[in-house]
């Protein structure tokens, strides 16, 4: 049996073809279409419609959140090969459309004078033709009236041309051209008309009945006696199905196009059906860079050479200050790092000397710090023993002048909390906080005459009646 599956050469050829397709796809321009700020529902829908125009070379499921800044989008666009940003924003008075070229600019800012969504355009048409296969390839760009009207007009034309991949008219496949994007410039009003169309190619030179027979859906001929009635008169067909064709849209096909009757070297009519969206734009300004930079052109503001020179000097001064701050910050970081390293070395040397010095003291017989602390504690205990012996011998506490060192040592220590004793109050049935009774400087004779607390002089039990003594037999 022969070996099943593809051969090694077939696998290699397929891998090389896939690699070429990926390289060709990466070489094409790609775009991000999103909104910035609080735009509202209609502007968000307009951004989705513009994203539909830019398919398939755009991020159709792009989600930009409020916390994402323009720098975040630029950082993401680099690895993905995105070359253009199309941003829609809205203020209290106007709607703006920005076209940015990545990564170095320029940025074109347009004011949206009027716009219509896809649903508005489709609802106004009697018949519309739009399906998913049309968006499998980028649209054909048509620029009209972009003549020698200034450098800003030439820049606009270049920016729009770079939005879509270039087309080689000698090698292009006509079956891949299903849509058309028309941008018309009006020199008088300086406005741009943005229109999006669907392209349909139909054969010419045939009657309405023959065109109906060539369609995929066969017409209803239940009321006809013969097929000649359909071919001769076109009975049963509405007048709206007959569209006027002329020299403006009839051409000879250089190659066969998908559709019945569209053969090579035959006459066919190219029909356009608007599918939206629709915008009327006016250029406001042209800036260097991505959103921030020198204004190269402005439609409403004009500045003299002195003002431009002053702006340029202020910008250069700002850049110099920024570079100076960065250099100072780098020096501070280096200095702190050196100080940290020197402190670490000094600490290690001190720890090393401390270890060496401790061993030398033990060898020479000098008491260490621990031993001196222990001797100090013994002195404190000796002073306490002297005070206690004086109290036992004399019967009262000594004066402060007799033992001044003990007082100073007590003051040096941090005072502790007072001790408390918790006892159960039998009468009330709850815990009570009782403090130790304070000792007063009285003689033992006075304490003996007074007796314990609550005891009477006659040996009774206080306020109550005394219990009789026991009899002694």
UniProtKB/Swiss-Prot annotation:
This is Suppressor of SWI4 1 homolog. One of its GO terms (molecular function) is rRNA binding. The modification N6-acetyllysine is found at residue 438. May have a role in cell growth. The modification Phosphoserine is found at residues 238, 240, 359. One of its GO terms (cellular component) is nucleolus. Residues 375-388 have a biased composition (Acidic residues). Residues 324-334 have a biased composition (Low complexity). Widely expressed. GO terms for biological process: maturation of LSU-rRNA from tricistronic rRNA transcript (SSU-rRNA, 5.8S rRNA, LSU-rRNA). It comes from Homo sapiens (Human). Residues 29-292 form the Brix domain. It is found in: Nucleus, Nucleolus.
């Amino acid at each position: 049996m022969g070996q099943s599956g593809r051969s090694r050469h077939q696998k290699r050829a397929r891998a090389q073809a896939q690699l070429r397709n990926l390289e060709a796809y990466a070489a094409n321009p790609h775009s991000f279409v999103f909104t910035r700020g609080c735009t509202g529902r209609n502007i968000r829908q307009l951004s989705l419609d513009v994203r539909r125009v830019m398919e398939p070379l755009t991020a159709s499921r792009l989600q930009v959140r409020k916390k994402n800044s323009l720098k975040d989008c630029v950082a993401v666009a680099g690895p993905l090969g995105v070359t253009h940003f199309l941003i829609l924003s809205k203020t209290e008075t106007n709607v703006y459309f920005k076209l940015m070229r990545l990564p170095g600019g320029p940025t074109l800012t347009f004011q949206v004078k009027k716009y219509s969504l896809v649903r508005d355009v489709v609802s106004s048409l009697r018949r519309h033709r739009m399906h998913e296969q049309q968006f499998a390839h980028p649209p054909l760009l048509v620029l009209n009236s972009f003549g020698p009207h200034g450098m800003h007009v030439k820049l606009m034309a270049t920016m729009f041309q770079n939005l879509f991949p270039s087309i080689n008219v000698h090698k292009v496949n006509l079956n891949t051209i299903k849509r058309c994007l028309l941008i018309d410039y009006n020199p008088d009003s300086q406005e741009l008309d943005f229109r999006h169309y669907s392209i349909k190619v139909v054969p010419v030179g045939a009657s309405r009945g023959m065109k109906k027979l060539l369609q995929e859906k066969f017409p209803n001929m239940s009321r006809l006696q013969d097929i000649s009635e359909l071919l001769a008169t076109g009975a049963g067909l509405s007048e709206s199905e007959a569209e006027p064709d002329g020299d403006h849209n009839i051409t000879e096909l250089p190659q066969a196009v998908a559709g019945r009757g569209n053969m090579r070297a035959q006459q066919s009519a190219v029909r356009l059906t608007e599918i939206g969206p629709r915008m009327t734009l006016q250029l406001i300004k042209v800036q260097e860079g991505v959103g921030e930079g020198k204004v190269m052109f402005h439609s409403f503001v004009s500045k003299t050479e002195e003002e431009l020179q002053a702006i340029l000097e202020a910008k250069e001064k700002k850049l110099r200050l920024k570079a100076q701050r960065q250099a100072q910050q780098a020096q501070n970081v280096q200095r702190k790092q050196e100080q940290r390293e020197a402190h670490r070395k000094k600490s290690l040397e001190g720890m090393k000397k401390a270890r060496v010095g401790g061993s030398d003291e033990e060898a020479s017989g000098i008491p260490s710090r621990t031993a001196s602390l222990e001797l100090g504690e013994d002195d404190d205990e000796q002073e306490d023993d002297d005070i206690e012996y004086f109290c036992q011998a004399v019967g009262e506490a000594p004066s402060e002048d007799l033992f001044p060192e003990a007082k100073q040592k007590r003051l040096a220590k941090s005072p502790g909390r007072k001790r408390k004793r918790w006892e159960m109050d039998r009468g009330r049935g709850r815990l009570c906080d009782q403090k130790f009774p304070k000792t007063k400087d009285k003689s033992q004779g006075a304490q003996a005459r007074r007796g314990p607390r609550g005891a009477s002089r006659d040996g009774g039990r206080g306020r109550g009646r005394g219990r009789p003594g026991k009899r002694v037999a």
